[in-house]
Amino acid sequence: MEDIGLLPSQIEFLAEDTTITVVPNFKMESLIFLSGEYGPFVPSFPIEIPLWLAISLKKKKKCTITPPDWMTYNKLKAKFQEENKIKDGFIELPENFDEISSLLLANCPDDIKDINKIRILKGDILSRREKKLEESLKSHLNSLTDGESVTTMEFKNFSMMEINKIRASYVSGINDLNKIQNSDNDNNNNNNNNNSNNNNNNNNSQQSQSASNASSRSLFSKK
C-alpha cells in the first residue's frame, strides 16, 4: 500500500499558520507576505499574527508570545481528567494541540507560566490517548471472525499528528494480518480441492471395482 501521508515536519509546518497573540516591543508598519499583511506593530499593543511569524520575532527578541487560552495548567489538568474518564473514545482537543504546544514549549519557555507542569501534562494527555488507541486496535482485531478481512477503523477527535504517528505501523500490521488470512484461505481451498480429488478417485476406484465384480459374476453365470 502506498504511503500518502504527510511527514511530521509537514504537519507542523501547516500548524504554523495558526494565528496567535503577541505583544511587540518595537514599532513598525505592516509586513506584507504572500500569505497576507500583518501589522502595524506598536509597542505594548497585542496583535494577532501567524505562529511562524511570532516565533521568528521571538527569536529576535522583538515580542512576547501569549499562549492560547487552553495552554494553562488548570485547563490541561481538566483535559487530562476528562480523557481518563472516557474509556472507549477520545476527548476533543484544541486544533493542532500537539504541534502548537510543542512549538511554544520549545521557542518561548519564558512566556509560559508553570511550564514544567504543562510539559508533563501535555505528555500525559498524549500518552493516555496513545494507550487507549492501542487498546482499541487490539479489541477491534480480537473481535474479527475467522476469514474476516481488516479494512478501516474510524476514530473521532483524533489529530492529524496523532494519526500520522500510528498510520505506518497500523497499515503495516493490517496488511500482514490480511496476508496471513489470505494464506489460510488458500490453504483451506487447497485442502478442500485435495479432499475433493481424493473422493473422486475413491469413487472411480469403487466404480471400477464394481464393474469388475459385475463382469466376473456375468461370466460365472454363463458357465
From Swiss-Prot:
Q: Where in the cell is it found?
A: Nucleus
UniProt lists the family membership as follows: Belongs to the GINS2/PSF2 family.
The keyword Nucleus is assigned to this record: yes
**Keyword Magnesium attached:** no
* Protein name (database record): Probable DNA replication complex GINS protein PSF2
**What biological function has been recorded for the protein in this entry?**
The GINS complex plays an essential role in the initiation of DNA replication.
Renumbered to this chain, region (Disordered) spans: 179-223
GO molecular-function term, one example from the UniProt record: 3'-5' DNA helicase activity
Classification via SUPFAM superfamilies? GINS helical bundle-like (SSF158573), PriA/YqbF domain (SSF160059)
In terms of InterPro entries, this protein maps to: GINS_A (IPR021151), GINS_bundle-like_dom_sf (IPR036224), GINS_Psf2 (IPR007257), PSF2_N (IPR056784)
Q: Which Gene3D superfamilies match?
A: 1.20.58.1020, 3.40.5.50
Q: Which PANTHER family match?
A: DNA REPLICATION COMPLEX GINS PROTEIN PSF2
User: Which GO terms fall under biological process for this protein?
Assistant: DNA replication; double-strand break repair via break-induced replication
Which superkingdom does the taxonomy of this entry point to? Eukaryota
- For bias type Low complexity, the affected ranges are 181-216
Its GO CC terms are: GINS complex
Question: Which keywords label this protein?
Answer: DNA replication, Nucleus
Subunit: Component of the GINS complex which is a heterotetramer of gins1, gins2, gins3 and gins4.
